[in-house]
């Protein structure tokens, strides 16, 4: 974001960064700070100013954000943060990434070696650790939370550490658990934790003496006028327009900027930034009522090929790898790059990363949302399907890492068979990390996708197995009524197929549930039914499961 501290002052951010984040004090102690604001008031901009100022010289700064689809992706912001810390690149093979993680971790402190397997697993690198493989999901979850926390705290003993999380309103439950753990340990480390979020986000940090919740209010009239002087200039003829803009936008900085940009694009204003003049009279000027309407109008005025490019980028997400955009844009490379240059000049997108692969991002989350919403449903569906196909083609060796994104695009692209496959893989991956709520969301979405496939025997078998998957994640959450409902549905489907093996597993799972809730006699009835089925089928695995729970029921 190309803006100076002087420009930040012009934005009316009346609380100076030094007052918000006293970096000198964090050298001795830790603080956490959070912004709770509506979009467009300048949270991200103020953070950018702070982390790029002299106040953080000599600090290690780690940044991460949450995506709107990230709630179904356990640890997504944490993974981004770790990739930045270990200087992971998209092209890194597992061997190379293992070397980076192992080398940096052990050079930091050999006492962190027990955390190595958890960190490698988070980064989708096989740990090759038999002890890790023997752990059950809750134990892995605890090791993961402890490992990331210990890494950050140990690093903070070497140098002041700033950890920044953006858009916590989109955070997943496992990242939330890590933040809660980290906040508890802040008093013992030189660590500044910054977070921003919208008002609907809830947390339990408010009572901490070292936590500050901050709010950037909309600009007061005098600050809004100062911002408009910086944007428009000081032509006396602009004063009625300035007042109209201040009244219409209610002091929202992003709304003000976008409104000015709209007036420039529609030739109401002529000249250059900081030296505009009116080309028409104020009574004839119409300013849209909301920032979303301003953005929608700006997008509609783009040349058709640039509008299509922006919309395609929005379907990819807020972060847009150039290679992926090229794969779906259906434009020659020269045309695509020219279009991106124009979109940057219009301040709709900007380059977020140059190395090792060029990546773009939207100027603001609202820009991304409005661009995505401007697409017709059929075109949106087509682009999602193309993106899923492009990810498979571009990253064939990294599909495990990309599985949540693949599931997201395949489902919204209505590529139902792939959606079922990737959603089930994503759910299994989440369950392995003890991210049970995210696993449930994936498995339930897979069931929705499955309903769109032809009703074959294989499809019904998958429907049963997905309900078994749901059982494994719902039980740790204590959601027993939903669990029973899915098991009864599985039983009904298995009976229609006369699938005795799956009926046996339904009986085992019902027996386990009844036994765990203190109904041993009823549980034994189900387990004995499973034993009989196992004996008839000579199914060793089913027999072992039935005998195991039968032994518990008669104890």
PLM regions and their residue ranges:
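Flexible helix-coil transition and linker loops at the boundaries of alpha-helical arrays
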Residues: 394-399, 449-463, 492-501, 534-540
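Tandem amphipathic alpha-helical repeat scaffolds
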Residues: 370, 408, 425-432, 465-479, ...
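Start-of-helix signal in alpha-solenoid helical-repeat scaffolds, especially tetratricopeptide repeats
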Residues: 360, 381, 385, 400-407, ...
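Short secondary-structure boundary elements
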Residues: 36-41, 46-52, 80-81, 181-182, ...
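Conserved Walker B catalytic segment
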Residues: 153-195
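P-loop NTPase Walker A phosphate-binding motif
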Residues: 41-72, 76-80, 88, 444
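Short hydrophobic alpha-helices and adjacent helix-cap/hinge residues
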Residues: 1-35
């Amino acid at each position: 974001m190309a803006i100076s501290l002087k420009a930040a002052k012009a934005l009316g951010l009346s609380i100076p960064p030094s007052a918000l984040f006293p970096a000198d004090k964090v050298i001795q102690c830790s603080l956490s700070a959070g912004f709770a604001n509506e979009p467009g008031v300048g949270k991200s901009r103020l953070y950018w100013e702070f982390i790029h100022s002299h106040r953080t010289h000599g600090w290690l700064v780690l940044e991460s954000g949450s995506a709107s689809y990230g709630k179904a992706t356990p640890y997504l912001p944490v993974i981004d943060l770790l990739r930045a810390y270990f200087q992971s690149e998209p092209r890194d093979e597992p061997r190379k990434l293992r070397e980076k993680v192992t080398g940096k971790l052990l050079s930091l402190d050999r006492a962190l070696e027990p955390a190595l397997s958890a960190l490698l697993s988070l980064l989708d690198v096989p740990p090759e650790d038999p002890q890790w493989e023997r752990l059950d999901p809750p134990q892995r979850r605890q090791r993961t939370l402890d490992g990331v926390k210990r890494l950050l705290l140990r690093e903070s003993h070497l140098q002041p550490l700033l950890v920044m999380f953006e858009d916590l309103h989109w955070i997943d439950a496992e990242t939330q658990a890590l933040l809660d753990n980290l906040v508890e340990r802040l008093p013992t480390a030189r660590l500044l934790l910054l977070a921003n979020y919208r008002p609907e986000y809830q947390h339990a940090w408010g009572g901490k003496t070292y936590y500050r919740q901050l709010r950037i209010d909309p600009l007061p009239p005098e600050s809004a006028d100062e911002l408009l002087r910086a944007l428009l200039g000081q032509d006396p003829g602009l004063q009625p327009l300035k007042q109209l803009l201040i009244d219409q936008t209610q002091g929202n900085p992003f709304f003000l900027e976008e409104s000015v940009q709209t007036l420039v694009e529609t030739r109401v204003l002529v000249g250059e930034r900081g030296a505009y003049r009116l080309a028409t009279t104020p009574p004839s000027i119409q300013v849209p009522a909301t920032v979303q309407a301003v953005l929608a109008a700006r997008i509609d005025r783009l040349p058709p090929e640039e509008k299509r490019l922006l919309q395609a980028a929005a379907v990819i997400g807020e972060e847009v790898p150039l290679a992926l955009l090229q794969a779906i844009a259906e434009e020659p490379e020269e045309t695509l790059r020219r279009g991106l240059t124009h979109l940057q000049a219009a301040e709709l997108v900007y380059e977020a990363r140059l190395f090792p692969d060029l990546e773009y991002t939207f100027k603001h989350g609202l820009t991304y949302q409005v661009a995505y919403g401007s697409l017709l449903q059929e075109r949106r569906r087509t682009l999602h399907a193309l993106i899923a196909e492009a990810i498979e083609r571009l990253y064939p060796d990294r599909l495990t890492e990309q599985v949540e994104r693949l599931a997201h695009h395949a489902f919204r692209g209505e590529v139902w068979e792939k959606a079922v496959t990737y959603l089930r893989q994503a759910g299994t991956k989440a369950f392995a990390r003890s991210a049970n709520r995210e696993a449930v969301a994936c498995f339930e979405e897979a069931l929705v996708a499955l309903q769109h496939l032809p009703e074959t025997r294989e499809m019904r078998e998958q429907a049963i197995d997905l309900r078994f998957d749901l059982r494994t994640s719902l039980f740790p959450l204590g959601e027993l009524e939903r669990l029973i409902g899915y098991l009864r549905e599985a039983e009904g489907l298995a009976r229609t197929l006369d699938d005795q093996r799956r009926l046996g597993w339904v009986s085992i799972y019902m027996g386990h549930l009844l036994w765990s809730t203190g109904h041993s006699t009823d549980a034994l009835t189900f387990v004995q039914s499973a034993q009989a089925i196992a004996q008839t089928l000579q199914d060793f695995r089913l027999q072992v499961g039935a005998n195991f729970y039968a032994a518990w029921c008669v104890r």
